[in-house]
């Protein structure tokens, strides 16, 4: 699963999911893409689940790009711990996704295969998504 090698701070603030994606909202590498329609946190496990579906579906013919990276640590306290005594330890990693952000890109397969693969990968995502094709 994806995670940063090192970060400047171990425990980041949660932040807000306001506004739309201003960067990473156009197709750059491939011909087909899966775009987020809602704001959310996508965990490294969910990104990996989507990647597995797409690589299995397209086999050797296609090329896949993952356009998001989980660089934010989410902390959790142990179950049954009393209030206080500081913030919990980092538990898992998430990618902060705003509406319009491209999640995956694909190339080297037909549109029908790409559409089916992206639809299955969309089931693994915790957010509504949209299938995009590159405008010539």
UniProtKB/Swiss-Prot annotation:
Coiled coil: none
Pfam family, one: Ribosomal_L16
Keyword Amino-acid biosynthesis: no
Residues passing through the membrane, by range: none
GO biological process per UniProt: mitochondrial translation
Zinc in keyword set: no
Classification via InterPro entries: Ribosomal_uL16, Ribosomal_uL16_bact-type, Ribosomal_uL16_CS, Ribosomal_uL16_dom, Ribosomal_uL16_sf
GO cellular component: chloroplast; mitochondrial large ribosomal subunit
Intracellular or extracellular location(s): Plastid, Chloroplast
Domain of life, per lineage: Eukaryota
Residues in the signal sequence: none
GO molecular function: rRNA binding; structural constituent of ribosome
Keywords carried by this UniProt record: Chloroplast, Plastid, Ribonucleoprotein, Ribosomal protein
Principal cellular location given in the protein's record: plastid
Alphabetized NCBIfam families for the sequence: rplP_bact
Family: Belongs to the universal ribosomal protein uL16 family.
Quaternary structure (record): Part of the 50S ribosomal subunit.
Protein name: Large ribosomal subunit protein uL16c
The encoding gene: rpl16
């Amino acid at each position: 699963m994806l995670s940063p090698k090192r970060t400047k701070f171990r425990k980041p603030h949660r932040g807000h999911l306001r506004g739309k994606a201003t960067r990473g909202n156009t197709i750059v590498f491939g011909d087909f893409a899966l775009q987020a329609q809602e704001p959310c946190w996508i965990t490294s496990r969910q990104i990996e689940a989507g990647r597995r579906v797409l690589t299995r579906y397209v086999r050797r013919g296609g090329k896949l790009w993952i356009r998001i990276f989980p660089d934010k640590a989410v902390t959790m306290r142990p179950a049954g711990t009393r209030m206080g005594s500081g913030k919990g330890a980092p538990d898992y990693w998430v990618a902060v996704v705003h509406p319009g952000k491209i999640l995956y890109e694909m190339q080297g397969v037909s549109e029908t295969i790409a559409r089916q693969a992206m639809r299955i990968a969309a089931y693994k995502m915790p957010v509504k998504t949209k299938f995009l094709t590159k405008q010539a």
